[in-house]
Design a protein with these regions (language model features):
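Phospho-regulated, Ser/Thr/Pro-rich intrinsically disordered or coiled-coil terminal scaffolds
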Residues: 1-56
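Small-side-chain structural scaffolding
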Residues: 8, 13, 75-76, 94, ...
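Alpha-helical bundle protein-protein interaction modules that mediate dimerization/oligomerization
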Residues: 42-116
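Extended intrinsically disordered, low-complexity regulatory segments in eukaryotic proteins
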Residues: 109-130
């Protein structure tokens, strides 16, 4: 579970780093807080032998028509940041499942394993700069 959460946190953190107005130390603090929040959230909803079980619960959804994801909001608040400071995309879905982290960024679907083996082969060029 920790490896998958780490992959998700790295992805979200890279998106936040695009916002140069947040100091590096705050981004690192946010990353640590998000990791802790996700471990707490997922601990009773992680099924190694049934990875699709609990999939909806483990989904991190960013969309203007939906409430802010509680784990992201908690991590931001713990760091003294506002959610809007993160400058995350308006549309993002991140599924964190055993052995796989999958992201739909706007309308592009990106799938990568927890070791990022294939990440740089499938990312659009504009995301490689994150």
């Amino acid at each position: 579970m920790r490896e998958e959460i780490a992959a998700a946190v790295v992805f979200v953190t890279r998106l936040i780093k695009l916002n140069d107005s947040i100091p590096k130390e705050k981004v690192e603090e946010f990353s640590s807080e998000l990791s802790s929040a996700l471990v707490e959230k997922f601990k009773n909803h992680w099924y190694e032998t049934e990875p699709t079980k609990g999939q909806g619960y483990r989904c991190i959804r960013i969309n203007p028509s939906e409430p802010i994801d509680p784990a992201i909001l908690k991590a931001a608040n713990q760091c003294g940041l506002q959610y809007t400071d993160l400058n995350l995309p308006q549309e993002l879905t991140l599924w964190v499942d055993p052995k796989e982290v999958c992201c739909r960024y706007v309308f592009v679907i990106i799938v990568y394993d927890i070791f990022f083996n294939n990440l740089f082969k499938v990312l659009p060029k504009h995301l490689l700069q994150i």
